[in-house]
Amino acid sequence: MESPALSEFDLHLFAEGRHWHIYNVLGAHLVNHRGTEGTRFAVWAPNARAVSVIGDFNNWDSGRHAMAVNNGYGVWSLFIPGVKAGHLYKFAITTRNGHHITKTDPYGQAFEHRPSNAAVVTERGHYAWGDGDWLERRNRFDWQQSPISVYEVHPGSWRHHGSGRWLTYRELADQLVPYVLETGFTHIELLPVTEHPLDESWGYQTTGYYAPTSRFGSPDDLRYFVDQCHQNNIGVILDWVPGHFPDDDFALAEFDGTALYEHEDPRRGRHQDWGTLIYNYGRHEVRNFLIGSALFWLDTFHMDGLRVDAVASMLYLNYSRNEGEWLPNEHGGHENLDAIRFLQDLNRVCQSRFPGVLMMAEESTSWPRVTRPPEIGGLGFNLKWNMGWMHDTLHYLQQDPVYRQYHHDKLTFGLLYAFSENFVLPLSHDEVVHGKSSLIQKMPGDDWQQRASLRLLFSYMFSYPGAKLLFMGGEFGQRQEWSERRELDWYLLQYPEHQGLRKLVQDLNGLYRRYPALHRKSFTSEGFEWIDCHDSTQSVISFLRNPGTPEHGPLVIVANFTPIPRHHYRIGVPTGGNWQEIFNSDSTWYGGSNLGNPLLLQAEPTPWMARPCSVELTVPPLGLVMLRPAT
C-alpha cells in the first residue's frame, strides 16, 4: 500500500540527531493522503527484517499491513486508510534472526491504561490554549532575580476522589491549582507523568516519552491542567527521566531485536541499582529521541521547565559499579563523554527554542559547572538541586538540641560552595519514603518541639540563598511517610497546630516574593553576609540577605536551633536607627509560644561582630526571626 513519503530532509536530520520536531514525523499521525483520510505510521527499526502495523482496526493481524523501509535510514512507514483517533496499535517486528516480537510505539502520544500497553492514535492541535499572556511574560522571565518556590506533587497521591480513585488532570486543575495559589508557590513540579507501566516506580521507569500517562486522563486533560496553572500565574515543571528506561519487553528494550536504544555492553548499558537499561547517548537517533521528547513537552504541553532525574548516573561510567564492572572512555577516564555532550545539547536546544524555561538537574555529586554554559565546559542547566545542603541540614536537625553544638559545621559548611552553582534547596519526595520518615517525624523531642523544629527548617530554607522546593504534605506537617498508594493525611488540617504550619509556609512564600533581599542575588555571594556563624555553644546563627539595590534594604536573619530562648542576644547590624521584626516562626499564628520582639529595636552605636552598630533582641526557642530597617 502506497505511503505518503517521509521527506529526505526529515530523515537526514533525524540521522544526524538534529530533528527538533521529530514527534511530527515518527509515530502515528492523522493525514489526508490524496483525498483519503487515515493514519501514517513510522518507526525507526534499522535492524529489523520486517515490520507491520497491528491494531484493533485489523484484528491484530501482522499479515495485513506490512510497512516499507527506507534502507538508508532504517525508518519504516505506512499509510493506512480509515484509521482514526482512538484506534489502538502496535508494531509487529521480525528480527534479523527471524524472531517475532511485538512492540509499542516509542513515539506514541497516548497509551492504554496499564497493564495494557498499546499506543492510541491521537489527534493533536485542537486544544484552545488561554495562556498567551503567561507565555509572553515567560519569554522575558529573569529567573535569577525572581522568586522560585516549587511545590513537588505526585498526582496520584496528592488527594483522592471520595471513592478512593485518583483525581483526573482536570480535577487536579480544579483542586490543586487553587491550593497552590493560596499557599503561595510559584511553580508545581509533577513527578513523572510520562507513561509508565508500574505505579510503584512513581513514573521514573518511563516507557512512553511522548505521552502523558492515561491514569489521570487524556493528553488534552493535561493541557487543561497546565493551562489553568498558567492562567493563575503558576509555572509547571515536568520531572523527566533520560538516564535510564525499564527492560519491559513490550517497550524500548532490544526494540528491533538488537540493542537499539541501549548500549549493547551491559557494563555501559545496564543500571545495576535499578535493574534498568542505560541509553546509548553516542547514537544520533537516540539523542534525537530524547531531545525530541523534551521539546515535545515544552512545545505541545507548554511546560515551563524540566527537572532532569539522576544526572549523576549519566555522567559517570563507573556510577555504582565496582572495578572491572565498567568500561573507561576513550581517554581512560570515568566520564561519560557522550552523556556530557547530550546534556549540553539538550540544554542548549531547549533554552534557545523556549526562552524562560527552567532546566533543573538532580545531580548528587560535586561535578563542576553543572549550571554553567557549555561554552565554558558547563552542562548548561539553569539550576541544580543542592543535595549537600539538604543532607547536612536534615542531619543537623535530627540531632538532639543538646548535641547540636557539636555539629555546627553542618549549618555553616554549605556557604563555602553555595554560589558555585545556581542551587535549588530540595526537601523532596526522596526524603520522606523508604523508612526515612516524614519531615516532622525526623525532628527530635515532643510534639511541640517537632512542630517548632519543622517551622524552623522551613524558615531557614526560605531565608537561605537559592530556589526552594517542598514535597507535598510537608507544608502542613504530614506525619506518615509518603506512599503512592494513599492520599495525604488531609484530616490533619482540622487541627490548629497543622493549620499553623501551613500558614507559616504561606507567609514564607509571601515574604519570599515581597522582599527582594530574599530572592535577588540568590545565586551570587553579593546577596549573603554572615553576621555570626561561630556561636556553636548556643546553636545560634545570624546573617544578612542583601538585595543588591539601594532602594531595597537588607534583612537580618537570626535562628536559634535549641529550645532555650535567647534573651538580650546581641548581634551586629549594618546601619543605625530602628529595626523591626517582620517575621517570627514562634508566632502563635503558626502554633508557637509568641516569644519575640513586638517593639522596634533601637540599634546602638556599639560596634559588634565587625559591624558599626548592634541590637539586642529576643530569639525564640527553636525559632527564626527576620528583621528589616524600620521606615
Curated annotation (Swiss-Prot):
CDD domains: AmyAc_Glg_BE, E_set_GBE_prok_N. It comes from the Bacteria. One of its GO terms (cellular component) is cytosol. One of its GO terms (biological process) is glycogen biosynthetic process. Its EC number is 2.4.1.18. PANTHER family: 1,4-ALPHA-GLUCAN-BRANCHING ENZYME. It is an enzyme of class 2 (transferase). This is 1,4-alpha-glucan branching enzyme GlgB. Catalyzes the formation of the alpha-1,6-glucosidic linkages in glycogen by scission of a 1,4-alpha-linked oligosaccharide from growing alpha-1,4-glucan chains and the subsequent attachment of the oligosaccharide to the alpha-1,6 position. GO terms for molecular function: 1,4-alpha-glucan branching enzyme activity; cation binding; hydrolase activity, hydrolyzing O-glycosyl compounds. Monomer. Pfam families: Alpha-amylase, Alpha-amylase_C, CBM_48. Keywords: Carbohydrate metabolism, Glycogen biosynthesis, Glycogen metabolism, Glycosyltransferase, Transferase. Pathway: Glycan biosynthesis; glycogen biosynthesis. The active site is at D309 (nucleophile), E362 (proton donor). Belongs to the glycosyl hydrolase 13 family. GlgB subfamily. It catalyses: Transfers a segment of a (1->4)-alpha-D-glucan chain to a primary hydroxy group in a similar glucan chain.
